Structure formats: C-alpha cells, structure tokens
Amino acid sequence: MKDYNLESRKFILAGVVILVLVTYVIRLFNIQLRNEEYKTLAENNAYYTKTVYPARGHMYDRNGKLLVYNQPSYDITFIPREAMNVDTTELCNALGMTLEEFYERMERIKNRKLNPGYSSYTEQDFVTQLSGEEFARFQENMFRFPGFYLRKRSIRQYNYKAAGVLLGDIGEVSRSKIEKDPYYGRGDYIGTQGLEASYEEALRGQKGTEVLLRDAHGRIQGSHSNGEFDQPAIRGKDLTLSLDIELQELGERLMENKIGSIVAIEPATGEILCMVSAPSYDPSLLTGRQRGKNHKELSKDKRKPLMNRAVMGTYPPGSTFKTSQALTFLEEGIITPETSFPCAGGFVFNRFKLGCHAHSSPTPLKPAIATSCNAYFCWGLHRMFSSSKYEGGTKEAMNRWRDYMVSMGFGYRLGVDLPGEARGMIPNADYYTKHYGNYWRAVTVISIAIGQGEVTLTPLQIANLGATIANRGTYITPHMVKAIEGDTIRQDYLTPKSTLVGRNSYEHIVEGMRLAVTDGTCRAANIPGLDVCGKTGTAQNRGKDHSAFMGFAPMDNPKIAIAVYVENGGFGATYGVPIGALLMEKYLNGELSEESKTKADEISKRVINYGTSER
C-alpha cells in the first residue's frame, strides 16, 4: 500500500529545493547587475564627459556679404550629486542672484514635469547665455563651486537689420523634438523659423565630446589620456543665399508702414533675389536672453510680423492673373492675338454685369492686357466654358482650364526652401458642383477670369508667374539657397519645369505686358533703357482694394521678375507699380537715380492705416 504522506513530503522537499535555487539565481543576477552599476558609477566618478558644441554655419548673400555669424556664449551647468556641498550664498553672490531666485531655479530644474530628463547624476542647465560681466565673475570664482561647470556655445549675430523672417532664428529644442531625434538633448539649440529651420541639419554641424579626468573629490584634473578618447565637434556648413541684401533692404524700406510682400526672382535660375514680408523686424531681437520676451511681443502683434506673407499669405491675384488666362485661351485655340471682344463698361451677359474702367472698345488681346480690360478676359473664359470642343461641356472645360493653371505653378506648393508655404486655391468642376449642384455655368464662375472669386495665390506664385512669362514657358522652383558648403542643392532647384503653353503664345503676352508699360496701366515702370514688361493688379477686397504688380526686365534676356502686393493699397499703379519699378532699377542699374531716390523716400514715408483689427 502506498504511503501518501511520504509522497507528499517528497513533493514539498522538491519544491523547497527549487525555490532555494531560483532565489540564489535571482540574487546572483541582481549582484551582477549591481556590480555593473557600481562599475559604471565608479567610471562616472573618475571621468566627466563634456559635450562640445559645434559652430553653426554662417550665411552669406549672393555677393558674398556676411549676413549671419556666431558670437561666443557661455552657460553654467551643474551635476546635482557633485554640487551638494556648495556654499549657496557665495554662489549667489558670484552670480548676482538672490537666494530666493536660486531656490526657485533649483525647484524648476528638479521638477520632472518641467524637466523630464532630470537626474542627480547628469548635467543640468543652471544659467544660460551669461553676459560678459557674469562670465568673468563666475570664471574667477569657479574653483569654489565643485560640480558647476562652464559650457561654451554660440548664439547668432547679424550684420543687417533686414530679412529677419527669411533668415529665421534658433531657440531651445522642444521636448517632442528630443523624443523624435536622438541627436538633441535638453537645452540644445535648433533652428525654429526661416532658413535656420529649413537647413537645420546642414547648419548645425555635429556635436563632439571631451573626456575629462576627475580626482577623488570630483574636481576636474584635465584631459583623459591626452584627449585620446575625445571626439571633435564638426562645424556646420555655410550657406550662400540667392538673396541680394541691398535689394532686400530697399524693399523693406519701401514697405515701411504697410502690410504686404515683395518677391523678386532671377528667371533663369529660380533664385530668389529678395523676399519682403511687411511688417518686418530686426533679426537681432530674437537673440540673447531677451529672445523669449521679444518673441512673445512679436507674436502678440496683430499685424503678424512673424508670418512670412510671401509664402504663407494667400490673396486674390487680381488682374495679374489675366496673363495666365490669355495664355490658356491662346493655347486652347479659343482666341488668336487678333480676337477682339466688346467692353460696354464691363462684361455684360443677360442681366449680369462685371464692371470695367473706360477704354476703347472693342479691343484685341495685346491692348486688352495693356489696359487691363475685364470684359476681354471674361468673354474669353465664357467662350472657353461654352465651347463645343469639350465633349463633357462646361465641367470638362473647367477641368482643362485647371490643368493649365496647375502647370503654371498654382494650386499647389511650389516647393520653396522655406517653412509654411501655402498652396493657394484653384477650383475644379467638382468644387463648383459641390456648391451649386449641376446648375452652374460659365457666368457663375466668371470672376475667376480676372483673378477674383475663389482663386487665391501666394505672392511667391505671382512672382513665379512673372518669371515663367519672362522665360517664355518654363520655370525653376524658386529657392533661397544658392550653394551649401561641401554639398549640393536639391535637384529640383536646378531643373526647369514646362507649362502646357507653347513659346509662341508667351511671346504675345510679353508684347502685351511691354505695351502696358509704354502705353498702359504700368507707365510708372517705364524706366529708360530697361525695357520693363508689367501687369497691374487691383484685387477687390471687403475694405480698400489691394494693390498688386507683376513684371520683369529686360524684355529680352530678363534678369529679374518681381511681384509686389500691398494690402489695402488701392489701385495697382498706386503702390505696386512704383515699388516694383524702383526695385528693378536698383537691381539692374546697381543704384537709383536721384529722382528715384526721392521717389523711394516719399513711398517709404507713406502710411496705410489698417486700424486695430488683426491682419
């Protein structure tokens, strides 16, 4: 007979043995882990690994003028575990800080909600961007404060007060960016706006490390193994911009006390010669320890100086858009250069009327461009959308029209190397069907023919239209950076794109734009010897109309294409044309005539009252 008590004892004994063995294995594992921890702690006590920050790349204008460079800056950091016995009163005296400020700062550093990476064994920021006086005072007394260190970095400096929104600025990296990119640590600087953000990886360089030896008291004794284990920092790459800083300064001066933008492009290369967003600001405001305060004030400004209107703002292009319509009508065979349309004070269809200013009627294409006849382009669109050549009727014609617009760079981002570029708006047939059902016709959408209605473009897209016409049908994606030190720019900044319109059609538009300058709405841009071609734009607005201009010069072998857009500036000839003319004269002639200097002074002093509402 089985002895069940004996069997039970065997199982219990086996269980006890297994439990003891498991306990010993766990303890051995823990001891091994602790030994590794103790080894790491011992090594950390013996050595201090210091991050060496690289110099950020400089920025130059197209003529080699230094725009952005670096100035040395020093931070005070500390390792809490090493700084436990520091005389806080003496430290506060050395830094010109009260004890209350000291303890408040320490509380913020130790607060893991504010500083999730906090550890008493790791380096923490204490004071950043010391003034020269603070640096000298602390360096002299640094030996009194074990566990506190000086860290050399650099902040940006600027040689000019212009182009702030283009150049951008640097600020402390966000927590979310640190989580996404292991390169960054708390307190690191990163490009936050403009080219500093777009070209962050090229500009930032590569951080290095310096391994320093400590004594038994934690004091730094010097380099470990004569720097054998150090990793040198690699400085950032310099950028040569396409920007002409003198042209940029003139543009910003002309736009003082106004809201709007200017974009100038070299047609052959797509290089942006100037890009003004008004109101502008001095880029040096966003450097140093006052950066946060100044950034907050600029952010609160209802005129939005931190917004780059040239790429982020979308506006009705007004009559500058008529050139794209003429190109489409010519290429589709809707009109010829000799086609004339009547203008009875505007476009009149049944009981609908879209007004126009006084000029001769009927008129063919080139005089229609020169006089900016609304009726001509409305009749052209009406003929296209009513044409029997499109089997799908108005909807097919509408989508064909949109194909032309997209090929000219509208309705999508062009791909400029600046953050925040907007798409603008080019509607298609589905858009109108959604809003009007199947009952819309050409007359329903007729205002798009003159750059109104649902059509919106960025000032950059308007300037690119000018560059495309100047090139007779091709453009290169507009860009701000001409060259990167030791690297190449993107391929699409070197490769021409073609529109759906042939060169011959463009020649007719060029002649019409030249006629606008010699005998039309752009006569204020008729500068002797420059052969300017232009097109005004007066974009309707709920308040006062916007003043726009798009042009290029010279007529043959053009060197500059430009768009000017002044919010609530009235007629295109009031602000757009004279500002555009002055900038083309400056760029092509190298300087302004005495008469033009007087005109520039007068325009810069003009004030447009925008009230107190947000823009």
Question: Which ranges hold each PLM region?
Answer:
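Beta-lactam-recognizing serine transpeptidase/beta-lactamase-like catalytic domain environment
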Residues: 68, 215-220, 225-228, 268-320, ...
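Periplasmic/cell-envelope proteins involved in peptidoglycan metabolism and beta-lactam response
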Residues: 1-290, 314, 336, 397-407, ...
